[in-house]
Amino acid sequence: MESLASLYKNHIATLQERTRDALTRFKLDALLIHSGELFNVFLDDHPYPFKVNPQFKAWVPVTQVPNCWLLVDGVNKPKLWFYLPVDYWHNVEPLPTSFWTEDVEVIALPKADGIGSLLPAARGNIGYIGPVPERALQLGIEASNINPKGVIDYLHYYRSFKTEYELACMREAQKMAVNGHRAAEEAFRSGMSEFDINIAYLTATGHRDTDVPYSNIVALNEHAAVLHYTKLDHQASEEMRSFLLDAGAEYNGYAADLTRTWSAKSDNDYAQLVKDVNDEQLALIATMKAGVSYVDYHIQFHQRIAKLLRKHQIITDMSEEAMVENDLTGPFMPHGIGHPLGLQVHDVAGFMQDDSGTHLAAPAKYPYLRCTRILQPGMVLTIEPGIYFIESLLAPWREGQFSKHFNWQKIEALKPFGGIRIEDNVVIHENNVENMTRDLKLA
């Protein structure tokens, strides 16, 4: 395998090319990219956890250091001012020397407010990309050049096409997340609480709870019916029925986003339904290829959901086609089939059809779908179908012409299990689809 250093060198060359194109198109001289700043909790001197600007970490794997600045013009070596204060109160990251520092000019920045004296004097034609517009104004950046929409749309669109360096980082993130999922399943099987399962996951991945790319969803029993359940009960459940884990990891700023669901027993209807959702998810991935709309795969999975609802007699006396047409599958899978993945968990440009930012919204029938792109080589997406038993979504169907088709007794029996979600991360290649998750033998 090519070294990360050589992959990074090619990655920077790609980013430089994209930057040249964007600067030419929007008549700018350079981009000033800000890592971000710490923001204090209201009426407190304690800051919120730092989250780096994703456009910053696209260039350098510096994810924990505020007050850093990148100046890029697509031609000269990128210049990084790395915040290096004299501070005995807080940990100070040393000036980096790593696989990537040969390709970036790294300069120590001892004072956060010292950046102004180090930037080019002429700043009227520099674009600022970052979370603190008032800082850009203080530095003399034109208001019209602060987070310019055209530039950001352009950069976001091409972020969909991952470089080999980015794919290498994402495969490493997968390994970490897979370790976490295995540890969490073991903790579940031993009867631990959600809180303790989460600790086991974080320990196995080497993350703090502020390091993971999103809040871990550690859901036992009926909690699996809450799509983004993040409460974490401290008490172990008296009866373990089911466990849904949606949790990822991050490597050099790139995310993994995996979900698995386990049944406590292997011989009940719920366990069979978990197996069937898993099989249908793999079957869908086997059909995926470049040149097809992501929306098509979402719609196809609703047809697969209909097949499972019929097989398990959750919906009866209705064809699979009629179930999808009348949206009887909707309350059982109330989210999209997945989303783009990369520097962000819900990565950018899911609706962009070109580098001008042309927006194609999700279909009216499926407004929660996060991607309407035609799949192309280099894209990374999640495939995460589910079946849930959510009373607020089922309640409207308890009356009306379709109520008789719902096997309410079966649904009541399944509600204590919450739901099921199975999520893999896939890469679209020219002639195949790589399943990064299954390649690591995560069942």
Swiss-Prot record:
Enumerate the HAMAP family for this protein. Answer: X_Pro_dipeptid (MF_01279)
> In UniProt terms, what function does this protein have?
Splits dipeptides with a prolyl residue in the C-terminal position.
**Residues involved in Mn(2+) 2 binding:** 246, 257, 423
- Its name, as the record gives it, is Xaa-Pro dipeptidase
- Keywords for this protein: Dipeptidase, Hydrolase, Manganese, Metal-binding, Metalloprotease, Protease
Q: Which GO terms describe its biological process?
A: proteolysis
Q: What is the lineage of its organism?
A: Bacteria, Pseudomonadati, Pseudomonadota, Gammaproteobacteria, Enterobacterales
Which cofactor does this sequence's record say it needs?
Mn(2+)
The cross-references to InterPro entries, in alphabetical order and at most eight, read: Creatin/AminoP/Spt16_N (IPR029149), Creatinase/aminopeptidase-like (IPR036005), PepQ_N (IPR048819), Pept_M24 (IPR000994), Peptidase_M24B_aminopep-P_CS (IPR001131), X-Pro_dipept-like (IPR052433), X_Pro_dipept (IPR022846)
For this protein, the record's PROSITE patterns field holds: PROLINE_PEPTIDASE
> Which amino acids does the record list as binding Mn(2+) 1?
257, 339, 384, 423
Q: What is its EC number?
A: 3.4.13.9
One Gene Ontology term of the molecular function aspect: proline dipeptidase activity
Give the UniProt family note: Belongs to the peptidase M24B family. Bacterial-type prolidase subfamily.
Instruction: Report one GO cellular component.
Output: cytosol
Give the reaction(s) catalysed. Xaa-L-Pro dipeptide + H2O = an L-alpha-amino acid + L-proline
Top-level class of the enzyme under EC nomenclature: hydrolase
Please share the entry's free-text remark on the cofactor: Binds 2 manganese ions per subunit.
